[in-house]
Design a protein with these regions (language model features):
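Bacterial N-terminal signal peptides
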Residues: 8-16
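Mature extracellular/passenger domains of Gram-negative fimbrial/pilin and adhesin proteins
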Residues: 21-335
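Extended interaction regions within the primary functional domain
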Residues: 1, 17-20
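Bacterial N-terminal signal peptides that target proteins for export
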Residues: 1-8
Length: 335
């Protein structure tokens, strides 16, 4: 019995030692701060080309973030982790390029507190020492000389809104085994990209398909995904006129929408939607970069693209009677 008691006591002491050793640090303000990159006004007719690498102005100073480690931290050094949800696509000159959206790859480098260049994403990087780490006092997260590189994989046409997104979430811990659960700061990007390459569709006017009155029971009789009996597709020819885009260029047209079900745009009546298709009635799946209508500009950098559309039942249920509509956006890209 005495041997068993001594073993249990030893195990308890070991567990307590591990709890004191392993600590997760936090932003000293209690709030996760953000280092943001604005991508507006970065691109022009020269660098808006496939394969071009654009280097944003260096953030040369310290990021200005302080962390604090909890009582019980036994060491004066920390580890930093730069975590991302993006997937690394390629590495060029040690920069790890991740696909940020349909148009761009992004990569970053930074210099840490021991004056060593790092190329995130990377976890549990050993940093320098600071006596405040073990004293439960704020200390600087000494990241500086941040360099953000962008690689164009698909040139922009017109204006593209890039919503604010987090590229890296930065964590500070006292061991390389602590969980990454409390962000200290983030590195984000976003902005409105406007380039000289411009294409105007339908002379800037809205393309409208009006199907008039359709009996509600016809939609339920048609079933999910089907067009009601007696309703014919409508056809529109969309005039495309481009500026600062080479004549005879190969382009594509695709569809963007906020509410989508399979290949259909969902209307403001959730039981109903619309299919938009090419001249052969092949649907264009909204928000799918690979679902496009290819076309070629003529010698005057112009073209006409045929669109067809028809209403369908989304759910197969009898819809509530009344007007219904959906709004989509046509986007032109380079092939």
């Amino acid at each position: 019995m005495k041997i068993i008691c001594r073993l249990l006591l030893a195990m308890a002491c070991l567990c307590l030692a591990n709890i004191s050793w392993a600590t997760v640090c936090a932003n000293s303000t209690g709030v996760t701060e953000d280092e943001h990159y604005d991508l507006s006004n970065i691109f022009n007719s020269t660098n808006n080309q496939p394969g071009q690498i654009v280097v944003l102005p260096e953030k040369s100073g310290w990021v200005g973030v302080s962390a604090i480690c909890p009582p019980g931290t036994l060491v004066n050094y920390t580890y930093r982790s730069y975590v991302t949800n993006f997937i690394v696509q390629e590495t060029i000159d040690n920069y790890k390029y991740m696909q940020l959206n349909d148009y761009l790859l992004g990569a970053m480098s930074l210099v840490d507190s021991v004056m060593d260049i790092k190329f995130p994403p990377q976890n549990y990087i050993r940093m320098g020492t600071d006596p405040n780490v073990s004293q439960n006092l704020p200390f600087g997260v000494m990241d500086s000389r941040l360099i953000f590189r962008l690689k164009v994989i698909r040139p922009f046409i017109n204006m593209v809104e890039i919503p604010r997104q987090v590229m890296f979430t930065v964590y500070v811990t006292s061991t390389p085994y602590d969980p990454l659960v409390t962000p200290v700061y983030t590195i984000s990007f976003g902005g409105r990209v406007e380039v000289p390459q411009n294409c105007e569709l339908n002379a800037g006017q809205i393309v409208e398909f009006d199907f008039g009155d359709i009996g509600a029971s016809l939609f339920s009789a048609a079933g999910p995904g089907n067009r009601p009996a007696g309703v014919m597709p409508q056809t529109k020819s969309i005039a495309v006129k481009c500026t600062n885009v080479a004549a005879q260029a190969y382009l594509t047209m695709r569809l963007e929408a906020s509410a989508v079900s399979g290949q259909a745009m969902v209307s403001d009546n959730q039981d109903l939607g619309f299919i938009v298709a090419d001249q052969n009635d092949t649907p264009i799946t909204p928000n799918d970069l690979n679902s496009v209508i290819p076309f070629r500009l003529d010698a005057a950098a112009a073209a006409n693209v045929t669109l067809r559309a028809w209403p369908i039942s989304i759910t197969g249920q009898k819809p509530t009677e009344g007007p219904f509509s959906a709004l989509g956006y046509l986007r032109v890209d380079y092939q």
